[in-house]
Design a protein with these regions (language model features):
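Noncatalytic, basic helical substrate-engagement surface that gates or grips nucleic-acid strands
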Residues: 2-135, 146-163, 168, 244-259, ...
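Acidic, divalent-metal-coordinating active-site segment for phosphoryl/phosphodiester hydrolysis
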Residues: 142-143, 206
Length: 298
């Protein structure tokens, strides 16, 4: 890497890739069990996604971030947080540990902290390297839009392994006409059905965005309640505690201190030694992907 050039860190939302891979194949009844009969469809898809992202975005460094269990500090704030989510399928359960173990074996840096979500780890890494590195985040979670800044872009997974919808801060500001951090305030009003918190009942994304465009923040809207229509004012007044709580739940925590040197995030070599290990472990689809992307079979 040119010493005058900023490092480029690829941050992978491990859970997003793992779940996406699991559901994409389990829907057709494909679990790809290993020699012990344990499903590997999610694990192999996760690694294939991550390897493809490396080949597309060409980072100099990389880390994978993981959720560590269901309970986080947000559950302490609100009992209903993610309470509406079903338990993972039995075929998925063993693949959580398998995915992280394989990620470590490949040589990727992995982060996971009990009580925190992968979003919070990604956010903290973004803040830690702010101004010192370019960052690309690979995820499927729109919550991460709040992390956009000049050196950060977010690649949302679309169809297949190599199609992404990439957001920069400029694109976000042009489309939403607010700053990325103000995205938190829009979610305070709309809530998040997938995360199980309601926001303000009766206020949808369009109204929420208009309110933040005009008044800047949740507190700005509250200060201007008398200027709002009677219907909107009544809805906000009825759900004021939940509005403020929803903003807390929507905000990504960015103050975890990892204090790792950049070298800890070095990319591993995709070499013949790693290939042989993957063959022995039965990860044939990963091996084919690695051969295709990095010519490791030669």
């Amino acid at each position: 890497m040119n010493t005058d050039q900023k490092p480029h860190i690829l941050l992978i939302d491990g859970m997003a890739l793992l779940f996406r891979s699991f559901f994409a194949t389990s829907a057709m009844g494909h679990y790809f069990p290993n020699a012990e009969g344990v499903p590997t469809n999610g694990v192999q898809g996760f690694v294939r996604h991550a390897m493809t992202a490396v080949s597309i975005f060409k980072p100099t460094h990389m880390a994978v971030c993981w959720d560590m269990g269901m309970h986080t500090f947000r559950n302490d704030l609100f009992d209903g947080y993610k309470a509406n989510r079903p338990a993972p399928a039995p075929e998925m359960v063993p693949q959580f540990d398998m995915a992280r173990e394989l990620s470590e074996k490949i040589g990727w840096k992995n982060y996971g902290i009990a009580g925190m979500e992968a979003d919070d780890l990604i956010g903290s890494l973004v803040c830690e390297w702010d101004g010192k590195a370019e960052v690309t985040i690979v995820t499927g979670d729109k919550d991460l839009l709040q992390l956009l800044r000049p050196d950060v872009k977010i690649a949302f997974m679309k169809k297949g392994y190599n199609v992404y919808d990439v957001y920069t801060e400029d694109r976000f500001r042009e489309e939403y006409e607010i700053s990325p951090m103000q995205f938190i305030d829009t979610k305070a009003f709309t809530g998040d059905s997938s995360d199980g918190y309601p926001g303000v009942k009766g206020i949808g994304p369009k109204t929420a965005l208009k309110l933040i465009q005009q008044y800047g923040s949740v507190e700005g809207v509250i200060e201007a309640l008398e200027e709002l229509s009677a219907g909107t004012r009544k809805k906000i007044e009825a759900d004021m505690p939940m509005l403020r709580l929803s903003r807390q739940l929507a905000e990504i925590h960015c103050k975890l201190d990892f204090d790792d040197p950049l070298e800890a995030l070095n990319l591993p070599d995709f070499n013949s030694g790693l290939r042989e290990e993957l063959v022995e472990m039965g990860y044939t689809m990963i091996v084919r992907q690695m051969d295709s992307l990095f010519q490791t079979s030669i």
